[in-house]
């Protein structure tokens, strides 16, 4: 009886310690957009909206695609 009581107490203490410890979330953080879009790479026929979106997602942004930033510049991959 004494051994069982010790094992159950130890198990409950371990469960309490694990549940009260801070856990890191596995999801990536989403970066806030500041002053509109965050633009990086130049878009080409090879580097299109899909690849731009994948790069933005892997960088922590919720989405991205190719935008015309100014009329005199080529399209840029912008994350938002």
Swiss-Prot record:
Disulfide bonds join 39-79, 43-66, 52-77, 56-78. Transmembrane segments: none annotated. It is found in: Secreted. Residues 1-27 form the signal peptide. It holds the Pfam family Defensin. It comes from the Eukaryota. InterPro entries: Defensin-like_dom. Keywords: Antimicrobial, Disulfide bond, Fungicide, Plant defense, Secreted, Signal. GO terms for biological process: defense response to fungus; killing of cells of another organism. One of its GO terms (cellular component) is extracellular region. Its main location: secreted. Belongs to the DEFL family. This is Defensin-like protein 50.
């Amino acid at each position: 009886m004494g051994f069982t009581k010790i094992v159950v107490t130890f198990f409950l203490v371990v469960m309490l310690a694990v549940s009260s410890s801070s856990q890191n979330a596995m999801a990536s953080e989403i970066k806030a957009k500041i002053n509109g879009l965050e633009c990086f790479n130049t878009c080409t026929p090879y580097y299109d909206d899909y690849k731009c979106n994948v790069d933005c997602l892997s960088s922590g942004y919720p989405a991205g695609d190719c935008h015309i930033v100014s009329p005199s510049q080529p399209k840029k991959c912008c994350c938002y």
